[in-house]
């Protein structure tokens, strides 16, 4: 009987753009398994990884999306389309299942409004702060609130409209207006592709290599998204493998507890966990620093040499980093 070859799994650093966009290589696989694994993983990471997204928007004074806003260049439909694209990195230990959180902009500035101007819950962090929202010519002309929940996959406007009606009594608000439902794209994975390549076509026994590339929205590392996708598949396959429990209902075959531990670990390892100002966070990301373990090694001089980090920002980072170390002393 032929022995199975040892399978080698690695990240392709040549094709890595950053921690959020990279590719992986698995080899050697038996002929046909490349497409089998690649297709299953791709579908799973695109549709089954939990995250959070906007499901409803309230704009002060607006009853429906065709209302005209004074002193704002964009119409309501355009603003809604921009707001539903705001992406959040969230802490699952704070953001419990089916809970609803609010992020808001209460008109405190005029000019061009970006996602970074939105104030959010402490368990949320906006990962695309440079997303353009609207151009306002007068302070106070535009005020809005975003209602955010967690979920998986894509939820359309009509489904969210029903959900808004169900939870309207739970929505706390500081402004007047109607809650307008929007589409929700919960998936933190923007793109996932695979290719199965024969690696020994001249041999009597042909084997394959699976190349799998993945790009996320910045709320989760690419390798963690792939890991979660694999765990979700394993949880389903374990159910099928348990032939002793045929015809029995398994209430926990998704292995929710195990799968949820991964985002929590991801939150604690990311610089997002330091709760830095948007300016400091963006400067570190542009310099390709994404993990706390990366910046722990830097001296004050190293921080001061990072572009767009002023003295106050350096002081903020070093203080927040020290606080983080003190709070996590003794943890591995």
Curated annotation (Swiss-Prot):
Assembly and interactions?
Homodimer. The RNAP catalytic core consists of 2 alpha, 1 beta, 1 beta' and 1 omega subunit. When a sigma factor is associated with the core the holoenzyme is formed, which can initiate transcription.
Q: Which Gene3D superfamilies match?
A: 5' to 3' exonuclease, C-terminal subdomain, DNA-directed RNA polymerase, insert domain, RNA polymerase, RBP11-like subunit
The region called Alpha N-terminal domain (alpha-NTD) is annotated at 1-244
Give the highest taxon in the source lineage.
Bacteria
Q: What is known of its domains?
A: The N-terminal domain is essential for RNAP assembly and basal transcription, whereas the C-terminal domain is involved in interaction with transcriptional regulators and with upstream promoter elements.
Say which family it is in: Belongs to the RNA polymerase alpha chain family.
Q: Which GO terms describe its molecular function?
A: DNA binding; DNA-directed RNA polymerase activity; protein dimerization activity
* GO CC entries: cytoplasm; DNA-directed RNA polymerase complex
Which keywords does the record carry? DNA-directed RNA polymerase, Nucleotidyltransferase, Transcription, Transferase
Q: Which reaction does it catalyse?
A: RNA(n) + a ribonucleoside 5'-triphosphate = RNA(n+1) + diphosphate
* A GO biological-process term: DNA-templated transcription
Which protein are we looking at?
DNA-directed RNA polymerase subunit alpha
Q: Which residues cross the membrane?
A: none
- Residue ranges for the region (Alpha C-terminal domain (alpha-CTD)) are 259-332
Q: What does this protein do?
A: DNA-dependent RNA polymerase catalyzes the transcription of DNA into RNA using the four ribonucleoside triphosphates as substrates.
| Alphabetized NCBIfam families for the sequence | PRK05182.2-5, rpoA
Q: What is its EC number?
A: 2.7.7.6
